[in-house]
Amino acid sequence: MADYKDSLNLPDTAFPMRGDLPKREPQWVAQWQEKKLYQRIREICAGRPRFTLHDGPPYANGDIHIGHAVNKVLKDIIVRSKTLSGFDAPYVPGWDCHGLPIEHQIEKLHGKAIPADKVRELSRAYAAEQVERQKKDFIRLGVLGDWGNPYLTMNFSAEAGEIRALGKILEQGYLYQGLKPVNWCLDCGSALAEAEVEYEDKNSPAIDVAFEVHENHTAKLAAAFGLTHLRGPAFAVIWTTTPWTLPANEAVSVHPDLTYDLIETEKGALILVRELAEAALKRYGLEGTVAGSCTGDKLDQMLLKHPFQNRDVAIICGTHVTTEAGTGLVHTAPAHGVDDYNIGKKYGLPVNNPVGNDGKFISTTPALSVGELAGKTVWEANPQVLQELEARARLLKNERIQHSYPHCWRHKTPIIFRATTQWFIGMENKKNEDASTLRWIAERAVDETQFFPAWGRARLEGMMKTRPDWCVSRQRNWGVPIPFFLHKETGQPHPRTAELIEQVALRVEKSGIEAWFSLDAAELLGAEADQYVKMKDTLDVWFDSGTTHWHVMRGSHAADHTYPADLYLEGSDQHRGWFQSSLLSGCAIDGRAPYKGLLTHGFVVDGKGHKMSKSKGNVIAPQQVSDKMGADILRLWTASTDYSGELTISDEILKRVVEGYRRIRNTLRFLLANVSDFDAATDMLPIDQWLEIDRYALALTRELQDGCRADFDKYEFHRVVQALQTFCSEDLGGFYLDILKDRLYTTAPKSVARRSAQSALWHITQAFVRLLAPITAFTAEEVWQVLTGKADDSVMFQVWHDLPALAGEGDLLAKWALIRTARADVTKALEAQREAGKIGSALQAAVEIHCGGEKYEALASLGDDLKFVFICSSTVAVRDDNEQVIATPLEHAKCERCWHVREDVGANTEHPTLCGRCVSNLYGEGEVRGCA
């Protein structure tokens, strides 16, 4: 008996079924570096419209974590998709290199006693080492970029650029020096920016303290409450969770419009806001009678006695007072709170700060009767202050509460508000009297920015409305200096500061920040040097990264950027970090945001929605995923997850991603295997010669490509992945490719029927591999090499595939949608026959499908080809308004070659095991297919 297996056009490809990604991907990385893929893409894209995604620099300290990986992969997806969209989309990665975490690492390694210049030298070397470690991991993820020439905020050009940016902001009138309360970390020994503060729960004392009304003001107080006199002493009661700030108290604030009651109790008359009075009395275990009431404005300027210092303080009015908790009267220490400072400024209160840089009370702090405060930390002072209040009978209640409290983001320790002389970028400052405030300019810039997702707008708007002035000075060594010479008597910057800044910048450009720290003032000031002191403060690291639009985009890497950038992309925490610092510096320098759009992604959590931490043992490191499963799996997971919320990852989730990847890979393998003997230059058929189902597949591919391109442009990558996976499983694997196998394998190799199928498959593969390229970068490159056979080529040298035009595409899609509905009905009927044991496969059945209307017309138009669509040996459409599918077993012989069960099997005596169409395909003119 003849063996006809060799007569089939069986699929053949060098593209392996198993991806073996952990092994193959590093080889691709090496190949890309060897052939300078990124540089070649730049050459090919030269002259195209520019798209600028400006990289927010990760901090150069420690290995990258899964959040870093998500961030870089999202950026790479955008850069790749924009390149395929016909843009020139360079990507210059950057690193944030100055700041306290690195300085702390140096102190850990070398001790705290090392001199400042040595700290800077060691910090620079440490940061460079960290950059190389992180760079290697980012490259392993398949991220394309100018890795040989990244921007580093510690590059001399960047350091000089930051100094020039500061000069510009000073020039515009937004920079000022002031004694104000700022976030202060006792462990850092430095001021913190808003972005360096995070809120955690803290257990604190919550105390109610009585401030006695001064005897000279009791009559005035009685009158305010509509009384002729007071029966005894009266007290204004405050509530606070920071007893240590009471030595710095300068006033008690009330709300001018709220109603306050004077309540007579056994401990004297207490002034409490009406809304909180009942709860307060209950807290004190007291009963009382309301003697009188008045609004807060009637109490303005009443004198009180400080609870333990021999001085008087006044009641003042402020709209910051609320009825959320406490007593409705607020202890006011201008040195230890922003609201306190602002209201104190209005009333001309002194800014009395008794706390030093180390968080300890200074030597001149007045002693308490129970002991000295001087030399004690603020936390040590708390119990002592409570003891003093108790001794003076001024403590009405002392309890512990759990509440949200600001912590240093590095040390995870509670911070304090502490007034120090710092440099600020003023939100209410103006360039000149006729100009708008920086806050107004920033709010307008937010309004002009596009947000992905849209909710980011409200978040940044809210922050701009309420944020305080930006404290940009730090008391550290490893940072860009604030290069001002301050007059020894007035404290004012030198009148030639703008000119001096440029001279310093030129020196820093050559030698780095050490040029300032080692500078002799006389070199720039001459004889004036004796009258000035050189500042030692450094700039907030958020100023470093926040001004990259100036010193990178329009400085060191201007050729690779356009200003403003099209997009900034970072995690949701950067609304209060890089997005905000960039916005403020951009508005201060240029009067606009340095970006047109902001994209925000959520944080990565484990499968149960918990934050990842080493202590919980739920950390998934990107390096482990790449080494075990492959970077393309991590990239596919990133793209398939809706980043607008939290991104959930677990071993189980990654397993599902692997399964999805395998389906895609198997589809790609089928496509490649069936075009391996197809040369588009010589074998491509004109579209009017294609079979109808092939034209339909092309229409589906165009729908896919148009939809994916739109989703790429909207940065909705999870929708792209959904569409690609649906196309693979339903349109291709579950329909088109299943139907196509018979035609591909059994018709003559060069027949119109087979070439039509291959023409469609070639276009599908060309489009599909490009749509995958931004996401599964390594796999797409592997497919491209097999598809083109050109080792020196790359899918990233291309643009989206130009699919051939197709007339009547809408009608075709509608018609085949009906056919697919009918096919689903047929499949159910065949499954019932299979379950009943009447057939083994669909090819052993004959099908009658009864239907009417458009469905019948669609099915009948396929004629004898209908059986190929249903993968049956015999199918007929019957016009009948009573829809039904009748499937019956066939009794004929099965063709050994095509497996169809046909009456004409054996009709040709020379080939007794073949059906008529196989004989024709092998030895005759070949069967004619019209539709499928």
From Swiss-Prot:
Enzyme class: ligase
Protein name: Isoleucine--tRNA ligase
Keyword Protein biosynthesis: yes
Cellular component terms per the entry's GO annotation: cytosol
Keywords: Aminoacyl-tRNA synthetase, ATP-binding, Cytoplasm, Ligase, Metal-binding, Nucleotide-binding, Protein biosynthesis, Zinc
Family: Belongs to the class-I aminoacyl-tRNA synthetase family. IleS type 1 subfamily.
Localization in the cell: Cytoplasm
Name of the gene encoding the protein in the UniProt record: ileS
A Pfam family this chain is assigned to: zf-FPG_IleRS
Sequence motif 'HIGH' region, location on chain: 58-68
Catalytic activity: tRNA(Ile) + L-isoleucine + ATP = L-isoleucyl-tRNA(Ile) + AMP + diphosphate
Binding site for ATP: 614
Enzyme Commission designation: 6.1.1.5
GO molecular function terms noted in the UniProt entry: aminoacyl-tRNA deacylase activity; ATP binding; isoleucine-tRNA ligase activity; tRNA binding; zinc ion binding
Amino acids binding L-isoleucyl-5'-AMP: 570
Cofactor annotation: Zn(2+)
Functional description taken from the UniProt entry: Catalyzes the attachment of isoleucine to tRNA(Ile). As IleRS can inadvertently accommodate and process structurally similar amino acids such as valine, to avoid such errors it has two additional distinct tRNA(Ile)-dependent editing activities. One activity is designated as 'pretransfer' editing and involves the hydrolysis of activated Val-AMP. The other activity is designated 'posttransfer' editing and involves deacylation of mischarged Val-tRNA(Ile).
Alphabetical GO biological process terms: isoleucyl-tRNA aminoacylation
Cofactor note: Binds 1 zinc ion per subunit.
Residues annotated to bind Zn(2+): 895, 898, 915, 918
Record text on subunit structure and interactions: Monomer.
